[in-house]
Each structure stands twice: as C-alpha cells, then as structure tokens.
C-alpha cells in the first residue's frame, strides 16, 4: 500500500505536487505540470529583467519581431509581464524585411497577426528601403558564401534605425541561452577575443548605440518552444533559406552533441564566459560615428557603408574575402599576446583560477 502511494506521488508535478506533469524541463530535469511550467518560465524571465535592471518606467521598448518562435514568445512575455508587474513600458514591434522571397514575406504575415493579437504598434523596415538592396539581390551578386556577413551587419543597423524612427530608447531581442552559448563557442573557435568579451553581456550597445537587452539570456530554446506550443502561439517555424551555409550551424551542431552528454552545458558555457577575465589590450576599440552615415562604429567608415560601397561598385564578391581576411589579421594583431599567435584569457571562480590558451 505504501509503495502504491509513493508510486502515485512520484507521478505528480514536482512543483505543486497536485497535477500530473506534462513535460520534463530541459533546464532543470523537473517533471512539471503545464500551469507550473507557465509560472516558473515567466517568473524566471521576470527575475532576469529585474535583477539586471533592463528597463525603467517610461522606457519606449522596441521588440525585435521576426515572426519566429523566440520573438513571438518575447512579444507574449513582454506584454504579459508589463501588465502583471506594471513595468510602465511603451512597447512596439519592430520587424526587418531582408527581402528573402518565400521566407521573410511569409514570416511578416505572422508578425502582422501578432500585432493584432497584442495590440502593439508595428514598424516594418526593409533592406530595400534602407540600402536599395534585398538579400535575394545580394546573394545573386556574391553567391551563398559570406552572405550572412552582409545580412548580420545590415540587420543590426536596421534595428537601430527602426528603433530611432519609433522614438524607442531600448531594443529587446529574443536571443536565448542556446544562441549565446553558440556565440561563445564561435568566438572561441575563431579566436575573436573582443567579441568573446562582450557576447555574454545581457545589455549591449550602451557605449553609444541604442541599448539592446536579452531577457531570454538564461532561457533554454527547448523551453521557449514548449511555451509556444502549450500556449498555442502563432509563430513562423521555417528556417532562413540561406542559414544552412552559416558558420553558426557548425557551433550549433557541436553544442547539441555536448548537450546530449551534459544537459547543463548551455548554462555552464554562459557562466564560464561570464567569469572570463580579459587582459587590457583585448578591450573593444573606441566607438565613433561613421563619416558617411553617422552610425556608431570603430572606424571612420562603418562596415555597412563599406559593404554597400563594394556592392554598388560590383566588387563585393572580390572584396568580401579580402575584408574577412583583413578582419582576421587585424584581430590577430590586436589580440595576440606573443609571437606564436596564441590568445590567452583567464577564467576565475571562487575556488580556482585557470588559464585557457586558444591557438589560431
């Protein structure tokens, strides 16, 4: 009789001990019911927002909205928490149309439906409008190799410009724990110490551009998918048709292999990167304004203007490989600590101090 009672008890939610569990949390391994999952998921993100002082009352916050699961859940969570905890924020949806036929045009329809559901003002800004190029045009010009370089640079600038048009003073994006762990791995594998230094920051852009925050920094992608599924949220699930050629895909596959062996690896990587201590010479360069467009950058001309110049001159395909090589060489020159091109960084914890050496 006692064994039967214990068996029945073990099948109950480990949080409320009342309802039957519907999932095992990837983040903690807890067997949890649907309502408790909603509660802990939302409470953890609220804690991240409050403990990191991401917002203050009266902020005008642009939510980067692509129509995908991350940005759709972000819109849901920001709307819900803003009302529940009276953040006092003015929220906006900001979508960037890169001009990818069969992908972005379809996902924008999802964003429009989200706008109607959440009753949040929506701004759509296109690459064509800003740069007179679409990503389809760029891929035709340069091919599939390196196209993510153009898209990443243009998208970051477009988000800032769109936020300014909305008179927003902050941007939030749906980057989750998996994304950040992947970025840490990418920067380690490339020996990109300046980017490694800032990629785990929950707020970026505070040096001049609009501050961007990541409320999902400690939120697993699998839990975001589960939240969207159980809440029956309307989101677009097709991957970008050019994404399979991105370098990030290799880091993602590597991370999945690691996670299969150690489920906590995602958070472990983030916490490890947070504890890195960098030498002074690895600091990011001083920011200034681009002499052509006025955008924040570290050179006289920002990368977006440089890429546009190459596109408009018909030399983008040739110069892309040159620029990428030059960027790698500059990174090596500014970050190498000896003549053997070895990058050194220190990781500290309360118990130990270790030195990690990454060779180019």
From Swiss-Prot:
Residues 327-360 are annotated as: Disordered. Pathway: tRNA modification; 5-methoxycarbonylmethyl-2-thiouridine-tRNA biosynthesis. One of its GO terms (biological process) is protein urmylation. Its main location: cytoplasm. It is found in: Cytoplasm. GO terms for molecular function: nucleotidyltransferase activity; tRNA binding; tRNA-uridine 2-sulfurtransferase activity. Residues 330-360 have a biased composition (Low complexity). The keyword RNA-binding applies. Its EC number is 2.7.7.-. GO terms for cellular component: cytosolic tRNA wobble base thiouridylase complex. InterPro entries: CTU1-like_ATP-bd (IPR056369), CTU1_C (IPR032442), Ncs6/Tuc1/Ctu1 (IPR000541), Rossmann-like_a/b/a_fold (IPR014729), TilS/TtcA_N (IPR011063), tRNA_thiolation_TtcA_Ctu1 (IPR035107), UPF0021_CS (IPR020554). Keywords: Cytoplasm, RNA-binding, Transferase, tRNA processing, tRNA-binding. It is an enzyme of class 2 (transferase). Belongs to the TtcA family. CTU1/NCS6/ATPBD3 subfamily. NCBIfam families: TIGR00269 family protein (TIGR00269). HAMAP family: CTU1. Plays a central role in 2-thiolation of mcm(5)S(2)U at tRNA wobble positions of tRNA(Lys), tRNA(Glu) and tRNA(Gln). Directly binds tRNAs and probably acts by catalyzing adenylation of tRNAs, an intermediate required for 2-thiolation. It is unclear whether it acts as a sulfurtransferase that transfers sulfur from thiocarboxylated urm1 onto the uridine of tRNAs at wobble position. This is Cytoplasmic tRNA 2-thiolation protein 1.
């Amino acid at each position: 009789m006692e064994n039967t009672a214990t068996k029945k008890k073990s099948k109950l939610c480990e949080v409320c001990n009342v309802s039957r569990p519907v999932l095992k949390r990837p983040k903690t391994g807890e067997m949890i019911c649907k309502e408790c999952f909603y509660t802990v998921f939302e409470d953890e993100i609220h804690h991240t927002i409050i403990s990191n002082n991401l917002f203050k009352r009266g902020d005008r916050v642009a939510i980067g909205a692509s129509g995908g699961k991350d940005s759709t859940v972000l819109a849901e969570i920001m709307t819900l928490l803003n009302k529940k905890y009276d953040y006092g924020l003015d929220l906006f949806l900001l979508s960037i149309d890169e001009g990818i036929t069969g992908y972005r045009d379809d996902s924008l329809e999802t964003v429009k439906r989200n706008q109607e559901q959440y009753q949040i003002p929506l701004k759509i800004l296109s690459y064509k409008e800003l740069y007179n190029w679409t990503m389809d045009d760029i891929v035709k010009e340069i091919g599939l190799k390196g196209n993510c370089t153009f898209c990443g640079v243009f998208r970051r600038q477009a988000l800032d410009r769109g936020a300014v048009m909305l008179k927003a003073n902050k941007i939030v994006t749906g980057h989750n724990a998996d994304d950040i762990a992947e970025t840490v791995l990418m920067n380690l594998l490339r020996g990109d110490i300046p980017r490694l230094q800032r990629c785990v920051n929950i707020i970026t852009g505070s040096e001049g551009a609009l501050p961007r925050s990541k409320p999902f920094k400690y939120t697993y992608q699998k839990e975001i998918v589960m939240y969207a599924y159980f809440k029956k949220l309307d989101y677009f699930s097709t991957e970008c048709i050019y994404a399979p050629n991105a370098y990030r895909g290799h880091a993602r596959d590597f991370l999945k292999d690691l996670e299969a062996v150690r489920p906590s690896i995602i958070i472990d990587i983030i916490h490890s990167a947070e504890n890195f201590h960098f030498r002074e010479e690895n600091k990011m360069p001083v920011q200034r304004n681009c002499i052509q467009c006025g955008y924040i950058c570290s050179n006289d001309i920002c990368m977006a203007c440089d890429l546009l110049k190459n596109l408009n001159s018909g030399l983008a395909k040739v110069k892309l490989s040159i620029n990428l090589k030059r960027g790698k060489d500059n990174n090596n020159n500014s970050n190498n600590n000896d003549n053997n091109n070895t990058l050194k960084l220190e990781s500290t914890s309360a118990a130990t101090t270790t030195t990690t050496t990454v060779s180019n």
